[in-house]
Swiss-Prot record:
GO biological process, one term: viral translational frameshifting
Protein name per Swiss-Prot or TrEMBL: Ornithine decarboxylase antizyme 2
Lineage: Eukaryota, Metazoa, Chordata, Craniata, Vertebrata
Family listed: Belongs to the ODC antizyme family.
Molecular functions (GO terms): ornithine decarboxylase inhibitor activity
Role played: Ornithine decarboxylase (ODC) antizyme protein that negatively regulates ODC activity and intracellular polyamine biosynthesis and uptake in response to increased intracellular polyamine levels. Binds to ODC monomers, inhibiting the assembly of the functional ODC homodimers. Does not target the ODC monomers for degradation, which allows a protein synthesis-independent restoration of ODC activity.
Record note on quaternary structure: Interacts with ODC1 and thereby sterically blocks ODC homodimerization.
Length: 218
């Protein structure tokens, strides 16, 4: 259960801001994730997409393009398409969605404002029982702990997903720190061949699995 671990997580320093410096990565994996998941939805037995798109395909050897998603890091807002709809909103969290359509899965945008002047956003792809969350390239801003916990609570209570996956490139300089951070939060490394995870050897996935039996009892 997310709430049972909330105090322990909020008391941690896992999401402490690092010193500003060299960016840890140069591109977003959200478009690649969307492309891969769409391909798996269309053909579960094939992990490589044959369609072209703005980002690298999951099984492509092409270099990562400089398509970092602005926003989601407390320093701006992404320009969402006109099809974006508000899915949920309260004092802590606002969730908007880009509905699934031909060639693309459902994309969710999580926005929270832990402090009056700080907007934190997370980008995610929803597919079946899994929510895939992109980890930003920049250091986590103040308030990221509370913001991410709100995301987990929403995923558990409203989306009713079985697992939340965080994903980031394996060649990031802060890879060890990210693995340690999310391991502390209860995430586990995903082994190759997982039914919900695209076959992308250069991307690392970690999963948080909800205890649905305990959730139903509550």
């Amino acid at each position: 259960m997310v709430k049972s671990n909330l105090q322990r997580i909020l008391n941690s320093h896992c999401f402490a801001r690092e010193k500003e410096g060299k960016k840890q990565c140069e591109s977003s994996i959200m478009e690649a994730l969307s492309s891969s998941i769409t391909d798996r939805m269309a053909s579960p037995t094939v992990c490589c997409s044959s369609t072209t798109g703005p980002g690298p395909l999951w099984c492509s050897d092409a270099p990562h393009p400089p398509l970092k998603i602005p926003g989601g890091r407390g320093n701006g807002a992404r320009d969402h398409p006109s099809t974006t709809q508000t899915l949920y909103s309260d004092r802590k969290l606002t969730v908007t969605e880009e509905p699934a359509g031909p060639g693309r899965p459902q994309i969710l945008h999580f926005q929270s404002r832990p402090a009056a002047a700080r907007l934190i956003q997370w980008e995610a792809v929803l597919r079946g029982d899994g929510l895939f969350v992109e980890i930003p390239c920049e250091p986590f801003p103040d308030g990221s702990k509370e913001s991410f916990i709100s995301l987990l609570e929403f995923a558990e209570e409203h989306l009713k997903v079985v697992s939340v996956f965080v994903c980031f490139y394996k060649n990031r300089e802060d890879r060890v720190k990210l693995v340690r951070t999310f391991s502390f939060l209860g995430f586990e490394m995903v082994k190759p061949g997982h039914a919900l995870v695209p076959a992308r050897p250069d991307v690392l996935f970690m999963a948080y699995n909800f205890d649905r039996d305990s959730s139903d009892e509550d």
